[in-house]
Amino acid sequence: MSSESHDKVVAKAIRLPTENYSVEKEIGKGSFAVVYKGLSLRDGRNIAIKAVSRSKLKNKKLLENLEVEIAILKKIKHPHIVGLIDCERTSSDFYLIMEYCALGDLTFFIKKRKNLVLKHPLIKTVFEHYPPPSTEHNGLNRVLVVNYLQQLSSALKFLRSKNLVHRDIKPQNLLLCTPLLDYNDPKTFHELGFVGIYNLPILKIADFGFARFLPNTSLAETLCGSPLYMAPEILNYQKYNAKADLWSVGTVLYEMCCGRPPFKASNHLELFQKIKKANDEITVPSNCYIEPKLFNLIRGLLTFDPDSRMGFTDFFNNEVVTEDLTRYEQSYEPDLESKSKDVAESNMFVSEYLVKPLKQQESAHIPPTQTDENTSVQTGVRRTSGKERLATNHPPHQQIHPEDNSQNPEQSYQSASQKRLKSSYNDLILEKEYVVVEKKTVEVNSLADDFANNGPITNNQGAQVIKPLRYRTSSSSDASGGRRASLVERRLSISSLSPSNALSKALGLASVRLFGYQHNTKATSSPPQQTLLNPQIFQELTENAVLRADHKLNPFSEQMLDSNITPAVESLAAKAFVMYSFAEMKFSQILPTPPSSTDYDPLSDKRLSNGSCAIEDEEDLDQGRPPSNQTLTSATTKISSATNVDTQIPAPELKKLCTESLLLYLKALTILAASMKLTSKWWYENESKNCTLKLNILVQWIRDRFNECLDKAEFLRLKLHAINTSPNSQWSDDDPVIFVEKLIYDRALDISRNAARMEMESGNYNTCELAYATSLWMLEILLDENFQFNEVYDDEYASNITSLDESDKEMIKKYISSIANRLKALKSKMV
């Protein structure tokens, strides 16, 4: 579909309650809102329309944030704050009619400048007049830095007078408008209340979704905002006041000077530790110079202790903030006003001036050495044919050459180094991952808390509600037998086992963990453990999988009645557990292990690298206890250990394992997020707010797995970063591209083939049944569009991640049908 056709579709799809505004095209998208460019039919001015769907605001806190934003914007009017023109509501959506800022946000000037100056006439003129200080970083000219600092200061001073704290100051929330529209000289510019230089793009603060009224004596405890720009007291979950905004101003000021944030990390805990360890010493890249008085201002704002941090009075009176810029207004660009008006009147948003990605037919002629393979590794998906993606013997060899607008600000856009291209994209992905914590973790935990705090619940038999099920790391037997070895420390060499027996043990363990199955185990006096699901549920799930394969059962409908929400969540929990277990198997190979370990992957009939822990020892399986869960102390409280690359595994193999594990955990996160999204919809449409014991336990389990998967994904990013930045790191254009779909596809077929062999050789029907079901669930995961990565990552990068093409889907459907027939035949033998 062409861009023009798409715009027409959008215009038809979005209908505002009144006829005062028309919608033209989408220009931005966030977690909860889509922003469109529109037109005011009353005066012909361009506007921005922020559309927020009520269905996305299931969490009460999210709805409150929107109401706060509307209330604040209605009360405040300031030339350096994006104004709210109107607000309209329908039964399904909120529409905020706002000022239109045609130049996007400050990140376009910092990260996309080198691309925009080639195409955008106004931006080209600005940077010709105020060139950047260096080609080695993305910092801005000092005049631009001070100009935008003063405009930001003006807006904050106004907010301060209203006892408002923004709480989410960052470059993405600092929008830029075209100058010289309502004025054409410095005098009128300043009479209208603007500060700074009259013929430069104008900065305005936007997005008050996290803002709140906070008097001088008040403290808040809410975790909000974007971690890269968060004050350390917020990162550490401490009470904070309006000074938190000053820290954020310091990070923005530093980024305007150096082209990157002052501190970077892959989770908020590590970020806090880095800030604390710096001990108020702010370092500047060797290729960047900041004048002393500007640097002293940055240091004053980026002071760890909020009590010692520069206050608002000192900030507003700082010599840089109050510097006279009128000498820069003497110069006059004769065509600047016409260029500015042309941009404002055009139908193009700033992002449309960026170089577009090459078409697929063009990319087919690009040699592999010119493509950024790490893009595919990070997302796990690439636009390839079905044969390329799923063929077991022929790796993919063509890919689209993506637009590289997302490089790390420290690096040159014109670098020819493949290593730096890959590293830069990876850095940006790590930065974007912060949004996951903000967007999904808060929602998942909030919903689980709502369930847990719903009061005593009884099941159908009247049993009192128990605590949410969690796997334990120790048991009562530990006291008598000494400390029980952790999963990392215990290893079992099963090379002597046949594939069938090994598969039986591994799948038997999985069945104990999830369904409560326990075959051929020793008698034990240990009390039975409550399992997440039970054998009867397993039978229902497998029967439903067969019926779906035979097209006799439709997927769960959207009618969220109490009678069918639990089965739907059970089905998703089973699929999430399958993906989580696959990721765990890969993850266990990455952690340091005894050199003598020789392990074996029973589900694929292949020997694994040292460090494998494909199955647990027989003690867990025989006693029927949930196995000890792997601890992530080194990943959460000792982050530094994650940067030590395991020397037992060669770097290329370790990198491959880390990438595979990361992709599998991300896929597990998408399934867990989808299950919570389904549950959230039912919960907030359920007026009684009552749930069964079973559903409550499911929700708590999903919450635990979500948090665990997120922690391990962050650990793996640190590991990959350590590998990529190691002095011995070697990049090769021949490095294989890893697709999460192919990992799942190959694994599903391996399990199915081994199960078929076991069925013929050993007759262990129960284990075979579980194996076939596991294979079916894995293949179903590939076909379910709700499990795509953008379920977790609601940002511009999700658009690069595509679903399988039709040939892929047809191939998978054939295997599903075949495996379902085997499972059906097996069940007839078991009757």
UniProtKB/Swiss-Prot annotation:
<keyword id="KW-0808">Transferase</keyword>
<feature type="domain" description="Protein kinase">
    <location>
        <begin position="21"/>
        <end position="321"/>
    </location>
</feature>
<dbReference type="GO" id="GO:0000422">
    <property type="term" value="P:autophagy of mitochondrion"/>
</dbReference>
<dbReference type="GO" id="GO:0005524">
    <property type="term" value="F:ATP binding"/>
</dbReference>
<dbReference type="GO" id="GO:0015031">
    <property type="term" value="P:protein transport"/>
</dbReference>
<dbReference type="GO" id="GO:0034727">
    <property type="term" value="P:piecemeal microautophagy of the nucleus"/>
</dbReference>
<dbReference type="InterPro" id="IPR011009">
    <property type="entry name" value="Kinase-like_dom_sf"/>
</dbReference>
<keyword id="KW-0072">Autophagy</keyword>
<comment type="function">
    <text>Serine/threonine protein kinase involved in the cytoplasm to vacuole transport (Cvt) and found to be essential in autophagy, where it is required for the formation of autophagosomes. Involved in the clearance of protein aggregates which cannot be efficiently cleared by the proteasome. Required for selective autophagic degradation of the nucleus (nucleophagy) as well as for mitophagy which contributes to regulate mitochondrial quantity and quality by eliminating the mitochondria to a basal level to fulfill cellular energy requirements and preventing excess ROS production.</text>
</comment>
<keyword id="KW-0963">Cytoplasm</keyword>
<dbReference type="Pfam" id="PF12063">
    <property type="entry name" value="ATG1-like_MIT1"/>
</dbReference>
<dbReference type="GO" id="GO:0005776">
    <property type="term" value="C:autophagosome"/>
</dbReference>
<dbReference type="InterPro" id="IPR048941">
    <property type="entry name" value="ATG1-like_MIT2"/>
</dbReference>
<dbReference type="InterPro" id="IPR008271">
    <property type="entry name" value="Ser/Thr_kinase_AS"/>
</dbReference>
<dbReference type="GO" id="GO:0000045">
    <property type="term" value="P:autophagosome assembly"/>
</dbReference>
<feature type="active site" description="Proton acceptor">
    <location>
        <position position="168"/>
    </location>
</feature>
<dbReference type="GO" id="GO:0034045">
    <property type="term" value="C:phagophore assembly site membrane"/>
</dbReference>
<keyword id="KW-0472">Membrane</keyword>
<dbReference type="GO" id="GO:0106310">
    <property type="term" value="F:protein serine kinase activity"/>
</dbReference>
<dbReference type="InterPro" id="IPR022708">
    <property type="entry name" value="Atg1-like_tMIT"/>
</dbReference>
<feature type="region of interest" description="Disordered">
    <location>
        <begin position="360"/>
        <end position="419"/>
    </location>
</feature>
<feature type="binding site">
    <location>
        <position position="50"/>
    </location>
    <ligand>
        <name>ATP</name>
    </ligand>
</feature>
<keyword id="KW-0547">Nucleotide-binding</keyword>
<dbReference type="InterPro" id="IPR045269">
    <property type="entry name" value="Atg1-like"/>
</dbReference>
<feature type="compositionally biased region" description="Polar residues">
    <location>
        <begin position="360"/>
        <end position="382"/>
    </location>
</feature>
<dbReference type="InterPro" id="IPR000719">
    <property type="entry name" value="Prot_kinase_dom"/>
</dbReference>
<comment type="similarity">
    <text>Belongs to the protein kinase superfamily. Ser/Thr protein kinase family. APG1/unc-51/ULK1 subfamily.</text>
</comment>
<dbReference type="Pfam" id="PF00069">
    <property type="entry name" value="Pkinase"/>
</dbReference>
<dbReference type="GO" id="GO:0004674">
    <property type="term" value="F:protein serine/threonine kinase activity"/>
</dbReference>
<feature type="compositionally biased region" description="Polar residues">
    <location>
        <begin position="405"/>
        <end position="419"/>
    </location>
</feature>
<comment type="subunit">
    <text>Homodimer. Forms a ternary complex with ATG13 and ATG17.</text>
</comment>
<dbReference type="Pfam" id="PF21127">
    <property type="entry name" value="ATG1-like_MIT2"/>
</dbReference>
<keyword id="KW-0418">Kinase</keyword>
<dbReference type="GO" id="GO:0061709">
    <property type="term" value="P:reticulophagy"/>
</dbReference>
<dbReference type="InterPro" id="IPR017441">
    <property type="entry name" value="Protein_kinase_ATP_BS"/>
</dbReference>
<dbReference type="GO" id="GO:0042594">
    <property type="term" value="P:response to starvation"/>
</dbReference>
<keyword id="KW-0067">ATP-binding</keyword>
<feature type="binding site">
    <location>
        <begin position="27"/>
        <end position="35"/>
    </location>
    <ligand>
        <name>ATP</name>
    </ligand>
</feature>
<dbReference type="GO" id="GO:1990316">
    <property type="term" value="C:Atg1/ULK1 kinase complex"/>
</dbReference>
<keyword id="KW-0653">Protein transport</keyword>
<dbReference type="GO" id="GO:0010506">
    <property type="term" value="P:regulation of autophagy"/>
</dbReference>
<keyword id="KW-0723">Serine/threonine-protein kinase</keyword>
